[in-house]
Amino acid sequence: MKDVLGATPVPYMKNGKFGYKDKVGNVVVECKYDAAYKFSEGLACVRLNGKWGFIDKLGREVIKCKYDTANDFSGGLARVVFNGKHGVVDKFGNCTLDK
């Protein structure tokens, strides 16, 4: 996993799994995800083994893949569902769920 000139990687699929490439086609994150979305506010939403989490541009899992659903970041927060409870998570992984 490498960061090429600070470029934002884009998702691609190979053999039914998703990873990320830089703008010239170099693999930045190997294909291991079941689903992968574009980067939003520096993080990308990915699904691994049926659970959602977030990676940074170097492919580091900064928010563990543990959510039932997750949306892109907007205004520093992402909407998530965990064990049937709705809430939001910040970029540090701090999660607030409805009671």
Describe these PLM feature segments.
Residues M1-K99:
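Residue-level detector of conserved, function-critical positions
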